[in-house]
Design a protein with these regions (language model features):
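Conserved N-terminal segment of class I S-adenosyl-L-methionine
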Residues: 1-197, 207-210, 289-292, 298-305, ...
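A short His-aromatic
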Residues: 198-202
Length: 333
């Protein structure tokens, strides 16, 4: 199989946008169309070397094929450092993309089992941060993996997702999941925690999402977010052009962490996300550096499974992903 990069973005509508953290329009280009095309080809080669030639096309999802097309251009805000697509896909097309996906039940069940193991560590970290248990809402609950992990830690979490197909699957496993987006969700009670894992960077309007989370939380509630680090992407791209050796290392770090081709709308850094949260009524409790969850499966070559176990933890020095925990600031008297 070979990738058809000539069709990138050909069926999408775009619009120019400003930085959603500071509102600025003064940016530096991080990657242009030719850069993204080169990265896409490098990403394809990276995974084709590590996967069996018999890998089903559907198992390439979130490796070389993503819900959104690769960006035309990636920029970095000169003021706050946010990395983002500009131009960006229009909101209505983004929503249609995520609501229309209908994976097979076997694929959803395999994802649920694999992701539940990964999410156990996040559920335990959440317990340590809050030093108590209570109620929570996971935004972008997808196959219900975190809901299962949270239940094991004796938390009562509900799910929220825009995709009715995956929501029906999660409900079939015994979880409470709502068909809605965060901005328009009207629950009957407030939550102790709102968790947004691996979804915040894909939302149409992260600023509006933070406001909504603030509205849904108790006065001392906590917002927990996990995102890819846009600063890491920009920094390693800049380093990669200085020599062939550095390009090889940089692309390997980015590929191991799903940052190559920047398959996200927004790439926050700890500093830019802290600024956004503080502006919207939260006090940051802490930031935890992280890496992409393991992706090796039964289609991964044996040497590549070992490589991922050994190499991926070493990439944490670049903080390719991070979690941030923030407490809802009490309203002024």
């Amino acid at each position: 199989m070979t990738p058809k990069w000539s069709t990138i973005g050909s069926h999408s509508s775009y619009e120019l946008t400003r930085c959603i953290v500071c509102g600025g329009a003064d940016t530096l280009e991080v990657a242009g169309p030719s850069d993204i095309r080169e990265e896409a080809e490098a990403l394809w080669g990276f995974h084709m070397r590590r996967l069996s030639p018999h890998t089903p096309p559907e198992r390439l999802v979130d490796r070389v094929a993503f819900s959104q097309a690769p960006p035309w251009r990636v920029v970095r805000c000169r003021d706050c450092g946010l990395v983002y697509r500009n131009p960006m896909e229009k909101r209505e097309e983004l929503c249609a993309t995520y609501t229309s996906e209908t994976p097979e039940r076997d694929a959803l069940l395999a994802l649920h089992r694999a992701q539940t193991r990964t999410y156990r560590a996040q559920a335990r970290r959440l317990v340590r941060r809050l030093e108590r248990r209570g109620t929570g809402l996971e935004v972008g609950s997808y196959v219900g993996a975190f809901l299962a992990a949270a239940r094991r830690e004796r938390w009562h979490f509900e799910g929220l997702d825009v995709n009715p197909h995956t929501n029906a699957f999660a409900r079939s496993l015994g979880f409470t999941v709502h068909d809605a987006d965060l901005e328009h969700f009207e629950p009957s009670h407030p939550f102790d925690v709102v968790a947004i894992w691996n979804t915040f960077d894909q939302l149409p309007d992260p600023r509006a999402a933070v406001r909504a989370a603030h509205r849904l939380l108790r006065p001392d509630g906590v917002l927990a977010v996990r995102v890819p680090n846009g600063e890491c992407y920009a920094r390693l791209r800049a380093v990669s052009v200085t020599s062939a050796e550095r390009m090889s290392v940089s692309r390997a770090v980015l590929a191991h962490n799903n940052l190559l081709t920047f398959p996200y709308r927004f790439g926050f850094s700890p500093a830019s996300l802290t600024r956004l949260l503080r502006d919207l009524g939260f006090d940051v409790m802490g930031v935890i550096p992280d890496v992409l969850v393991p992706t090796a499966d039964e289609w991964t070559r044996r040497w590549a499974v070992v490589e991922e176990r050994l190499v991926k933890p070493l990439t944490k020095r670049w903080t390719p992903w991070f979690e941030i925990y923030a407490r809802r600031r009490p309203a002024a008297a």
